[in-house]
Amino acid sequence: MKKPLNKLEIKNLTFKNKNDDYIILKNLNLDINSDKVLFLLGSSGQGKSSLLKTILKQTDVIEGTILFNKQDIFQLNKKEWKSFLKEVSFLNQTTTSIPFETVFTNIVRSLQDYKNLFYNIFNLVSKSQKEEITSVLKELNILDKIYHRVDSLSGGQQQRVEIAKLMMQKPKIIIADEPTNFLDPNISKNIIELIIKMAKKFNSILIIVTHNVNLIHEFDSSILLIKNQEYHFYKSNKEINSNILDQVFKND
């Protein structure tokens, strides 16, 4: 039986930074489903990262709301909010791993069970968790690096470690903020393929922020373009052409 889609609904959203009165984006209406990746595009300073922060309640919302599977995230109590955050995972442009520790140890540290005192002191995982870590690394083609220090890996391999950590968490929402910013084109495409594959596996909503306009033509996706407090949504990347992109990134 097919799983129901996870869904993020943004309704009439207007928001600003907490430290000033500048309105970043006005009247945003958008549905994001787990059956299709959303690429978020815009030049620097247009509010892409601020929109992601709004999902985490880190900006001031003037109007509107965000629903996750029909539940208003701005109305969640403390316990419900904590539970929601466990469903959200981030992939950044730089590694969050501890460079002088091994791939395995970094993945163990990322497990939610690591907050348990037993894991914290003894750095141990269950047999099933170890088997899962091994399986994930094999799927990402870095099993041979399991006991290597993270700082001995290439940039692409380090991003695969970050993806492995996300796979262990099985998130319902994945936010990838410029995940291939420092990687060459071929590796960038491969990393995005892995992220999309992971999102499909876990039925996750996937939002990818990128400046790389070449990537959006490589994958079946929807596109949100942001510029000058306004947005344009395209249900398919096939609707995007070079003239549209030139306008978005003009003067960037």
Swiss-Prot record:
* Signal peptide extent: none
Domain ABC transporter as annotated: residue spans: 8-252
Q: Where does ATP bind?
A: G42, S43, S44, G45, Q46, G47, K48, S49
Pfam families annotated for this entry? ABC_tran
- PROSITE patterns xref list: ABC_TRANSPORTER_1 (PS00211), ABC_TRANSPORTER_2 (PS50893)
What keywords tag this UniProt record? ATP-binding, Nucleotide-binding, Transport
Gene3D superfamilies from the UniProt entry:
P-loop containing nucleotide triphosphate hydrolases
A GO MF term: ATP binding
Instruction: Please give the InterPro entries that the UniProt record associates with this protein.
Output: AAA+_ATPase (IPR003593), ABC_transporter-like_ATP-bd (IPR003439), ABC_transporter-like_CS (IPR017871), Metal_Ion_Import_ABC (IPR050153), P-loop_NTPase (IPR027417)
Give the PANTHER family listed for this entry. METAL TRANSPORT SYSTEM ATP-BINDING PROTEIN TM_0124-RELATED
Q: What does this protein do?
A: Part of a high-affinity transport system.
What family does the Swiss-Prot or TrEMBL record give for this protein?
Belongs to the ABC transporter superfamily.
Protein name in the entry? Probable ABC transporter ATP-binding protein p29
Taxonomic source organism: Mesomycoplasma hyorhinis (Mycoplasma hyorhinis)
Q: What is the lineage of its organism?
A: Bacteria, Bacillati, Mycoplasmatota, Mycoplasmoidales, Metamycoplasmataceae
